[in-house]
Design a protein with these regions (language model features):
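Periplasmic c-type cytochrome electron-transfer domains
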Residues: 4-7, 21-332
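Bacterial N-terminal signal peptides
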Residues: 9-19
């Protein structure tokens, strides 16, 4: 009896499973999968490092300062504020779902999250530290020495372990179960009529040529300003990495997941509202001027891409010891 029921249950699951996959497969956007295969001990350690401002020269700036997980993984300002209140050159993209990206940074200069994570600690305009000093700080904190030993099995902390742990934590920062994903997975009443019409416009106008896949972006580099040039603060974009002039003004297509939370928009953070961003995209990328109503529907659709935000207890960081090098918040 029990086995028979189990078999029926399995058959039903298998059937539903295929139906779900087929429904999602015919759309250019796929639902986000919850994080799988993460090392939980490493995630906990990486979470602490992500929130630890002692990895910065000032002792004041952590990853979370610019990628605030209470605010969609961004800082919600046009360009970031770094060490000594320096104004950064470019808008901070969200860390949410960044594990789905083809590469990291607007110009894709880091291949993956691990490579990316070493950058900001040593960037003079961001955390302004050195990897050696960051390791000295961690090695002086007994709580960290214990935890690194548990996770990596050695008494000696190095930058490779630090970036590995941060990247592992970042893998958990995905946002499944948005209303749009529920719709993709078969819940037909998850979207309103306006939102569905917005999605249809998004597809039929050609937005999906660049914003597609699980991340609704993040998987290719494209020119900003195909039909009309972008008038904002332009940098070289992808050409800075490839040295190829054809890649000028090419940027990694940003993910549109949680886009309602990640304002202001574009690499220079010049536009604050989705209404403006959709208008700019329509005109510059597709040569299309949307009516007010069309624009509002696309915006309504974009807002259905907000998923479940990562939930966890705020990590409590191990205290410094008498030997911990002191922060230098005001220069020196
Ligand atoms: C002072 C602000 C600041 C701090 C601190 C900071 N970042 Fe960033 N982060 C940025 C900016 C700005 C960019 C975009 C830079 C670029 O593309 O050239 C970025 C890019 C990224 C990206 C790439 C996302 C994408 O879609 O390309 C990831 C991932 C990331 N940061 C993670 C981290 C981690 C992990 C830390 C801590 C070790 C950190 N950041 C610290 C501002 C900051
Ligand atoms: C040819 C490729 C392409 C097409 C087509 C395209 N986009 Fe984009 N989209 C991009 C790129 C590249 C960026 C980043 C540009 C930058 O920051 O300079 C972007 C940025 C955005 C942003 C800002 C996201 C952020 O976090 O800054 C929104 C919103 C957006 N697109 C929506 C749309 C909509 C809606 C359409 C259809 C009307 C569309 N896009 C069509 C490539 C494209």
């Amino acid at each position: 009896m029990k086995t028979k029921l189990t078999r029926i249950a399995l058959a039903v699951t298998a059937l539903l499973g295929t139906a779900v996959i087929q429904a999602a497969d015919t759309e250019p956007i796929q639902p986000i999968k919850p994080p799988a295969n993460v090392n939980l001990g490493m995630v906990e350690l990486g979470k602490k490092l992500y929130f630890d401002p002692r990895l910065s020269k000032s002792g004041f700036i952590s990853c979370n300062s610019c990628h605030n997980l209470s605010m969609g993984g961004t800082d919600n300002i046009p360009t970031s504020i770094g060490d000594k209140w320096q104004q950064g050159p470019i808008n901070a993209p969200t860390v949410l779902n960044s594990s789905l990206n083809v590469a990291q940074f607007w110009d894709g200069r880091a291949a993956d999250l691990k490579e990316q994570a070493g950058g900001p600690i040593a960037n003079p305009g961001e955390m302004a530290f050195t990897h050696t000093l960051a390791i000295d700080v961690l090695q002086s904190i007994p709580g960290y020495v214990r935890e690194f030993k548990q996770v990596f099995g050695t008494d000696k902390i190095d930058i490779d372990q630090v970036t590995t742990a941060i990247a592992e934590f970042e893998k958990t920062l995905v946002t499944p179960n948005s209303r749009f994903d529920q719709w993709l997975l078969g819940k037909k009443d998850a979207l309103t009529k306006d939102e569905l019409e917005g999605y249809k416009l998004f597809k039929d106008s050609g937005c999906v040529a660049c914003h597609n896949g699980e991340g609704v972006g993040g998987n290719s580099f494209q020119k900003m300003g195909i039909v009309e040039p972008y008038k904002g603060n332009t940098s070289d974009g992808r050409a800075a990495v490839t040295g190829n002039d054809a890649d000028r003004f090419n940027y990694k297509v940003p993910t549109l997941r949680n886009v309602e939370m990640t304002y202001p928009y574009f690499h220079d953070g010049a536009y604050w509202t989705l209404t403006e961003a959709v208008d700019v995209m329509g005109r510059l990328q597709l040569g299309k001027k949307f009516t007010k109503e069309e624009n509002a529907r696309i915006v309504a659709f974009l807002k259905t891409l907000t998923g479940e935000q990562p939930k966890f207890l705020l990590p409590i960081l191990p205290p410094s010891s008498d030997k911990t090098p002191r922060p230098t918040p005001f220069g020196k």
